[in-house]
């Protein structure tokens, strides 16, 4: 914008200079004609007309000189202002170009380290890479490379996102499976606690039953002992009766033998 305004001022100044040159040449021509007329003293009206034209031309030239001087001053001031604007615009353009290179390099570093934490050394790396980037990449090519880098970053980001989604799904599935196993574990723990309580109860019953059995055994042993004692007493009485019976039987047998002998003697 500033360069266009500067060219317009320069064009306008050149046009005024050309106009001044034409008028100057015309003035010199008319002045020559006037001098020639004065030398011959002919055609007074023509001379007066030329004098008037000369006066008008002189005034016009004076005005043009004044305008030109003022125009040059204004033009110089305008040129100075426009040159300042041009320098500022150039500085801004250079800053934008540097910013474009920095953006490109920053994206390149981002793509290279996608998913990792921000490296504080990136700014130093960018400063070190800037000269090589400016040498190898024209300013008009930075935008295209930046777009390509952004596309690459988008692709990498999409891959990372898909990987994260896959891992998230795996984690969710694992959590669901963990919940199922935890529920089963709780059920098993409940069952184990029930079985443990039942086992303790059975053990208590077994201990109680064992105690009762021991008591029963003791009672049975006592009864057995008493029974044995009674049996021994009964066996003692039976032996005594058997001995008596045995003696009676012997006496009876002796008597029978004696009777048989007496009968035999009588028979004889």
UniProtKB/Swiss-Prot annotation:
Residues 171-243 form a coiled coil. The keyword Coiled coil applies. Residues 231-268 have a biased composition (Acidic residues). Disruption phenotype: RNAi-mediated knockdown results in embryonic lethality in 10% of animals. Surviving animals have a reduced brood size and abnormal diakinetic oocyte morphology. Residues 229-268 are annotated as: Disordered. One of its GO terms (biological process) is positive regulation of chromosome organization. GO terms for cellular component: nucleus. The keyword Ribosomal protein does not apply. Keywords: Coiled coil, DNA replication, Meiosis, Nucleus. Its main location: nucleus. It is found in: Nucleus. Plays a role in meiosis, germline development and oocyte morphogenesis. May play a role in DNA replication. In the germline, involved in the maintenance of transition zone nuclei and in chromosome structure and organization, but not required for mitotic proliferation. This is Protein atz-1. The gene is atz-1.
């Amino acid at each position: 914008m500033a360069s266009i305004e500067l060219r317009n001022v320069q064009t306008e100044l050149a046009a005024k200079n050309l106009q001044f040159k034409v008028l100057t040449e015309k003035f010199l021509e008319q002045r020559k004609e006037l001098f020639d007329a004065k030398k011959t003293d002919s055609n007074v009206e023509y001379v007066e007309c030329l004098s008037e034209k000369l006066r008008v031309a002189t005034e016009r030239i004076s005005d043009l000189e004044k305008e030109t001087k003022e125009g040059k001053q204004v033009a110089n001031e305008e040129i100075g202002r426009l040159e300042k604007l041009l320098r500022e615009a150039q500085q801004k353009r250079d800053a934008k170009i540097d910013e474009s290179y920095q953006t490109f390099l920053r994206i390149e570093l981002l793509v290279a380290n996608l998913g990792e934490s921000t490296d504080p050394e990136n700014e130093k790396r960018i400063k070190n890479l800037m000269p090589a980037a400016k040498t190898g990449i024209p300013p008009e090519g930075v935008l295209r490379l930046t777009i390509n880098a952004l596309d690459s970053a988008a692709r990498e980001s999409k891959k990372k996102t898909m990987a994260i989604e896959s891992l998230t799904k795996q984690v969710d599935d694992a959590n669901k499976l963990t919940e199922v196993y935890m529920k089963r574990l709780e059920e098993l723990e409940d069952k184990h606690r029930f079985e443990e309580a039942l086992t303790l109860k059975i053990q208590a019953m077994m201990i109680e039953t064992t105690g009762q059995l021991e008591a029963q055994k003791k009672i049975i042993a006592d009864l057995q002992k008493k029974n044995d004692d009674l049996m021994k007493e009964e066996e003692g009485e039976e032996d005594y009766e058997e001995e008596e019976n045995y003696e009676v039987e012997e006496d009876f047998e002796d008597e029978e033998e004696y009777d048989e002998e007496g009968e035999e003697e009588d028979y004889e």
